[in-house]
């Protein structure tokens, strides 16, 4: 229930390669493995959103979709600013980037590259990162409240090697 008026909170499931932003209260849920999700929230006025990207960089071929971190990060910031958030009031929370494959090649650590892209972009934008849960060998489920900025985190079980 919404703290403001007792009405049910709207819920949105964020699929990989997507972004969702809301100026009103909404709970955005996603599930992460090697993908990364960045939550941006306006700490002064509320409202915010989340992206969920699978690969770090778009190579210029095909569609420039938010499945690529370089696109997803730009889209998320543009959309959060479009709902009235102010860049100087934004804070970020970053999740995911796990290495779930036991045979994962050191030459292609997708999770690590996704984390690096997100953190570098936020640093360039001078947006403070106030919470992270990154890397490791377990998946995650996160639920972000766009009005309060609270993110609930659940972790999967560690797989035995």
Swiss-Prot record:
* Domain of life of the source: Bacteria
List the protein's name.
Probable chemoreceptor glutamine deamidase CheD
InterPro entries in the cross-refs:
CheD-like_sf, Chemorcpt_Glu_NH3ase_CheD, Cytotoxic_necrot_fac-like_cat
Give the catalytic activity: L-glutaminyl-[protein] + H2O = L-glutamyl-[protein] + NH4(+)
Please tell me the species this chain comes from: Trichlorobacter lovleyi (strain ATCC BAA-1151 / DSM 17278 / SZ)
The enzyme's main class, written as a single word, is hydrolase
Q: What does the UniProt function comment say about this protein?
A: Probably deamidates glutamine residues to glutamate on methyl-accepting chemotaxis receptors (MCPs), playing an important role in chemotaxis.
Q: Which GO terms describe its molecular function?
A: protein-glutamine glutaminase activity
Record has Lyase as a keyword: no
List the Pfam families: CheD (PF03975)
Task: Write down the Gene3D superfamilies for this protein, in alphabetical order.
Answer: 3.30.1330.200
Gene Ontology terms: biological process:
chemotaxis
Keyword terms of this UniProt record: Chemotaxis, Hydrolase
The entry assigns this protein to a family as follows: Belongs to the CheD family.
Question: Which EC number applies?
Answer: 3.5.1.44
